[in-house]
């Protein structure tokens, strides 16, 4: 790591800031202070109420006002699969499942029944995960106005801490569920990790995935699970984290009162994190899989990890900052080279982090995604770029851009400190509890970086990065598709690629500095010619002197966010499906625009230009409209306007860049043919859209047939008349600040003064009748995927939007209850209802992943439940669960900028599912829903079934 940088910078900084006072007062030499300072804990988030109970349990409680009236609850355990003995492989994860299947105060499934009756959704709000060294349970979006519910959720956490029932019957029923989870998750990436972990670790604790051995999962005696639970689920390994809109002091008292009585076991087993062995010679491992979506190379240079007790210090914080600067600069060079025709990789990047899955070993990592067959050459190219940086260092201009970028991030986080979501703040607290990571807070992060930034110079960084690429502790791993024409690179060429790059002598890098403006000369600003307000949506609409319209909605949901869209009628629906060339051009149109220059700036120059700016704008040719979308923080609103202006006025060809991006696209498409889910999704899209050529899946032949010049002209034509467009901005907008920018950059866009004549519409064809597509697919882990899509015409309004959503939610809950919990026929069966405003249709979607032996039963159950829904066969309990959840979620959505952006855009097309929505939802009765559902039927259903069969050996 870069620890020496930290010491040098802190010494320099403290000498500069403290030296005068120390000399005057005759105190100790300030140069002796940094190491002591480095070891002091970071205590920036003093507003977090935290403590350790006498039994060893830790707690962290934080008042947070966003989202309003909601709270998130977590119990984090420093417990995971590394604590299993060889007879318990998979039981840490199994125990996580059992926490939802009976506790002392909530027998059986009563916990989920109760929480769902109170608006909380299993999966979305109620969930958990198990890792190698941690298990975390969460209950999110709890309405804080419901005091009884808040107390009940605390009781759930208490039961998860010490009172999980582990009933034998429930254990046996859950075995099948976990077996289906294993089947569903055992894709090529999981198989790769299953193969690589025993090779790169000598320690058995890190040699298996947390889901474990299915032989053990299906056969372990109850006692093994209970032994693991009682041994490791104990207060000294547990942390309670609660973040939300509540009285933190009162919450702290409740936590102390409820969790203090939990007993800490006597003679508890020590919690040991296994150390990871070093290696003198390079470890090399290569793995091929017929379903692998791409070739990837991972190169790790292992390092000693910072001890846990030293991680919550200024020194550790400083180390993280310097690592971020280094990776930012190297990534910029890797990205810049990827834009060259001779580059053999599609993507490459570096990062510092845990060595694979272990917290006790750290690593500097280089990831490479080769394009074609020459894996060693792609690896060599990326390694040479990294080695050159480590050998010759960075330039002042590179470092300044990296510091500008990091400063911009710190500023944005600080600006959002009062509007950051519960989940984001909770994740920081969880990482602090489990890993002792720095808990400074955004204000201190920003203040510290402002103070030390000037001390972080190339003279400091360059000597230190020389030690990153070591001769020992190298680990090289290759993961690639198994297919004809692609061969494994082999140990010798890959080790040589790394070693030769490290030993090669390089010339210093010369950075191309961007000094010219994006826009050479701006025209005289236009004017706002008319203003009107929309009280219902809370918006202000401007008409500009060139005929363009602008809609502004000011919100306080996020302190430093502006979301943007501009749209004009058009899109795919205006392309004649019989015009093959135009259809082929659709396949690469958006890519062609993003490959092109804005003014004189190609992609590499644009990346440098945007350093230190939190802003993005992209082009989109959609189904029913065309235009731009983007976002910025407040300070970068001008840059966002410059980008908008440039798309409209100076979109210039870059055929070399397009050729590179086309090649990447073709490589990705060829690789995706290995993925069974690609075959499934292609079949689904083709069936749903009746093989409309504009909507069917892209092919290599189609994208290669696309004409770059024609596509660029097509895009320019869509932006030739600003009077066709409405520009929508939502966020923390100061109208007085934004209006001059609108007049300069939007009112001066090219315009014909009035909207263009409407283009001819060629409606996208949609399936009619009942269609079933069924096929077999060779798979390494055979499984069956089922997708059923039922739809019909409907009036588009708030009532329809609510009713179809609730119907889908009931169906989803029944799938979980019957197909997963009762029958164990699938791990995660799902259903949803949605309103398709564009086609004025309701949709009910069912998705199941199961196995060949149980597929008929699972499909039968799914269809029976769908028939019940359409017949209005819904119980009051089922209805109340989904209605309360919908109310809870809608209240949260109302404080989301993207929700309002979508609502305003829909209103432009005469679509209104907002007016009266909340009142209609609150007043909806079961009888209302049943009456509405009886108007639906199954006359239009597409079903796609892909059945896995074993691969031929």
Residue ranges and their predicted role:
Residues 114, 163-166, 170-171, 455-460, ...:
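Peptidyl-prolyl cis-trans isomerase
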Residues 170-237, 241-256, 263-273, 277-293:
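Hydrophobic, small-residue-rich alpha-helical packing segments that form membrane-like cores
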Residues 23-61, 247-316, 320-331, 335, ...:
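Proteolytic maturation boundary segments
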Residues 62, 67-84, 90-92, 109-159, ...:
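M16 family metallopeptidases and their MPP-like homologs
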Residues 1-27:
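Bacterial Sec-dependent N-terminal signal peptides
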Residues 163, 168, 175, 189, ...:
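Non-catalytic, conformational "gating/processing" segments within enzyme and secreted inhibitor domains
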Residues 167, 264-268, 391-399, 654, ...:
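Flexible helix-coil linker/hinge segments at domain or subdomain boundaries
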Residues 91-99, 326, 589:
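Active-site His/Glu-centered metal-binding helix of metallohydrolases
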């Amino acid at each position: 790591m870069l620890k020496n940088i930290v010491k040098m910078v802190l010494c320099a900084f403290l000498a500069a800031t403290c030296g005068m006072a120390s000399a005057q007062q005759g105190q100790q030499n300030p140069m002796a202070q940094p190491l002591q300072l480095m070891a002091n804990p970071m205590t920036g988030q003093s507003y977090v109420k935290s403590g350790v109970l006498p039994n060893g349990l830790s707690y962290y409680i934080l008042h947070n006002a966003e989202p309003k009236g909601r709270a998130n609850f977590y119990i984090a355990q420093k417990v995971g699969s590394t604590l299993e003995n060889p007879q318990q492989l998979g039981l840490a994860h199994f125990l996580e499942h059992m926490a939802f299947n009976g506790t002392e105060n909530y027998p059986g499934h009563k916990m989920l029944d109760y929480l769902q009756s109170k608006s909380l959704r299993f999966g979305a709000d109620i969930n958990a995960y198990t890792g190698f060294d941690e298990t975390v349970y969460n209950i999110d979006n709890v309405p804080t106005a419901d005091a009884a519910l808040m107390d009940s959720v605390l009781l759930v956490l208490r039961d998860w801490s010490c009172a999980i029932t582990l009933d034998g019957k429930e254990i046996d029923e859950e075995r099948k569920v976990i077996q289906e989870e294993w089947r569903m998750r055992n894709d090529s990436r999981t198989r790769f990790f299953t193969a690589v972990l025993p090779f790169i670790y000598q320690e058995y604790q890190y040699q298996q995935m947390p889901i474990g051995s299915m032989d053990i999962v299906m056969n372990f005696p109850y006692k093994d699970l209970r032994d693991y639970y009682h041994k490791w689920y104990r207060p000294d390994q547990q942390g309670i984290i609660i973040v939300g809109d509540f009285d933190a002091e009162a919450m702290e008292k409740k936590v102390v009162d409820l969790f203090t009585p939990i007993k800490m076991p006597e003679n508890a087993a020590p919690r040991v994190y296994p150390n990871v062995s070093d290696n003198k010679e390079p470890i090399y491992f290569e793995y091929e899989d017929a379903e692998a979506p791409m070739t990837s190379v991972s190169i790790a240079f292992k390092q000693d990890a910072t001890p846990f007790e030293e991680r919550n210090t200024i020194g550790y914080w400083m180390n993280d900052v310097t690592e971020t600067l280094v990776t930012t600069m190297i990534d910029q060079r890797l990205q810049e080279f990827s834009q060259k025709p001779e580059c053999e990789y599609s993507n490459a990047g570096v990062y510092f982090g845990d060595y694979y899955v272990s917290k006790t070993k750290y690593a500097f990592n280089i990831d490479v995604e080769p394009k074609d067959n020459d894996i060693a050459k792609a690896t060599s190219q990326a390694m040479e770029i990294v080695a050159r940086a480590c050998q010759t260092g960075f330039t002042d201009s590179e470092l300044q851009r990296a510091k500008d970028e990091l400063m911009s991030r710190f500023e944005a986080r600080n600006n959002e400190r009062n509007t950051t979501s519960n989940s984001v703040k909770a994740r920081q607290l969880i990482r602090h509890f489990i890993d002792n990571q720095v808990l400074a807070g955004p204000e201190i992060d920003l203040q510290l970086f402002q103070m030390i930034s000037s001390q972080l110079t190339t003279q400091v960084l360059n000597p230190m990065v020389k030690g990153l690429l070591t001769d020992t502790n190298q680990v090289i791993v290759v993961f690639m598709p198994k297919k004809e024409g692609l061969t494994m690179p082999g140990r010798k060429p890959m080790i040589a690629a790394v070693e030769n790059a490290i030993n090669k002598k390089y010339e210093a890098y010369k950075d191309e500095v961007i000094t010219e403006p994006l826009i050479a000369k701006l025209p005289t600003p236009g004017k706002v010619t008319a203003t009107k307000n929309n009280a219902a949506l809370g918006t202000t609409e401007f008409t500009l002197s060139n005929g363009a319209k602008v809609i502004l909605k000011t919100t306080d949901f996020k302190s430093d966010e502006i979301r943007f869209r501009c749209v004009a009628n058009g899109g795919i629906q205006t392309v004649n499906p019989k015009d093959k060339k135009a259809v082929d051009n659709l396949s690469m149109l958006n890519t062609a625009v993003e490959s092109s220059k804005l003014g004189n700036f190609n992609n590499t120059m644009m990346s440098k230009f945007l350093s230190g700016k939190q802003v993005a704008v992209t082009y989109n040719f959609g189904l029913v409209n065309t235009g731009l979308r983007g976002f910025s923080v407040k300070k970068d609103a001008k840059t966002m306007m410059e980008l908008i202006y440039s798309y409209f006025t100076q979109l210039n060809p870059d055929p070399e860049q397009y050729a590179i991006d086309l090649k990447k696209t073709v490589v990705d498409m060829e690789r995706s043919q290995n993925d069974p889910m690609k075959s499934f999704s292609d079949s689904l899209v083709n069936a749903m859209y009746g093989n409309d050529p504009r909507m069917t899946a892209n092919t290599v032949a189609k994208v290669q047939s696309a004409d770059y010049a024609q596509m660029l002209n097509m895009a320019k034509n869509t932006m030739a008349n600003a009077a066709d467009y409405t520009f929508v901005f939502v966020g923390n907008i100061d109208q007085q600040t934004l209006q001059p920018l609108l007049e300069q950059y939007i009112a001066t866009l090219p315009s014909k003064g009035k909207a263009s004549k409407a283009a001819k519409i060629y409606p996208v064809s949609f399936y009619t009748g009942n269609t079933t597509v069924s096929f077999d697919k060779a798979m390494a882990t055979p499984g069956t995927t089922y997708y059923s899509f039922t739809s019909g015409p409907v009036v588009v309004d708030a009532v329809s939007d609510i009713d179809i959503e609730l119907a889908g939610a009931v169906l989803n809950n029944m799938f979980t209850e019957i197909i997963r919990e009762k029958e164990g026929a699938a791990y995660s069966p799902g259903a949803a209802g949605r309103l398709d405003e564009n086609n004025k249709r309701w949709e009910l979607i069912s998705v199941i992943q199961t196995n060949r032996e149980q597929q008929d039963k699972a499909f039968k159950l799914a269809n029976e439940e769908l028939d019940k829904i359409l017949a209005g066969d819904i119980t009051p309990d089922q209805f109340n669960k989904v209605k309360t959840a919908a109310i809870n979620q809608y209240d949260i959505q109302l404080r989301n900028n993207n929700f309002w952006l979508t609502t305003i855009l829909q209103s432009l097309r005469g679509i209104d599912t907002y007016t009266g929505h909340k009142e209609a939802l609150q007043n909806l009765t079961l009888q209302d829903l049943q009456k509405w559902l009886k108007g639906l039927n199954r006359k239009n259903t597409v079903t796609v079934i892909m059945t896995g069969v074993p691969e031929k050996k």
